[in-house]
Amino acid sequence: MTANAGPATALQLAELDSQGFTIIEGFLDRERLARVNALFDAWLGGYQGRNNFEGTCTERIYTLVARDRVFQDIVEDPRVLALCDALLAPNYLLTASQAIVIGPGETPQPWHTDDYFYPIPRPRPMVSLSTIVAVEDFDAANGGTEVIPGSHRWSDAEVAGYYRQGDSEEDPALA
């Protein structure tokens, strides 16, 4: 996937290297954001989580790129593709496109990594890149994903020992 990729910015690449994430401010224009929210409004109500990890008060809508062209356009955004091109091996693949809508009263997930299934010891070279597109305010109070800056450089032992279910959600290391 390298359709119309532009150059990644030096700042974004430096942030990804040092802290493990970067933010693309103003990623969705108003028209695209309105389209995404209208689609979600129409679809929500039939996709409750199936287990404790997914959450029983959370809805997940899978395969967004198969549902509407707007999601294909988001996935192929040149700013994201530029980062993928700079950081991943050629011919990388999209493995998931989903919406996660966390409902009131949801139990927080235990801290985890999204690349646990790669059988390569940590710390390791970048083998995947996750993209989160927030379509509303995104914070700990409404269940927004929290990240630990620099945790992408941790060893397997550090990842395994950091967080256990029931630990304080107010941990200052969580950003």
Predicted segment positions?
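Short, conserved beta-strand element in jelly-roll/cupin
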Residues: 121-140
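Short C-terminal domain-edge/linker segments immediately following a structured domain
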Residues: 54-57, 125-131, 160-168
